[in-house]
């Protein structure tokens, strides 16, 4: 494993100023066969939230996180989890949208969470895709909620519906004015290269000496 970090105390780009930032990371090796990607895989599957409660000081209860991690690790090894992603800045709704981008599969959310909690930070929480049958078993774990059903090409939440393609364009286009993702369309004809003949290759069929000592 590895633990590291970086402190960025200054930085500017044109008229954009970067505030002092502390970034930390941790990496642990694992088997590729036990890795699960984040993109939603199958229509009809269920999206379930493994929540992360906090104490009075607002700190995550690590015992709950460890229990969830151990449980999910065993379910991944058993092949019961199709997709999984840690809830990040922006909350459950933003994280689910990023999971939808890969295969353009949407989610129809239920009413198991109040609207504001879909956009609240749940650091330490995990979104999981699994079958409807397994979701019922998963929901027996503490601090879990079934959020909705995967399918279609849009995200549906509290009566609002937005196409996944529209969300993806908005997400990818945020930094286009600063770092364009596509080169300008330059109308130029490609040059015609002259034809060249293949150069014959020669091989030596005799064995070469192999000295054992070099002086």
Regions found by a protein language model. Give the residues of each.
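Short hydrophobic/aromatic beta-strand micro-patches
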Residues: 127-131
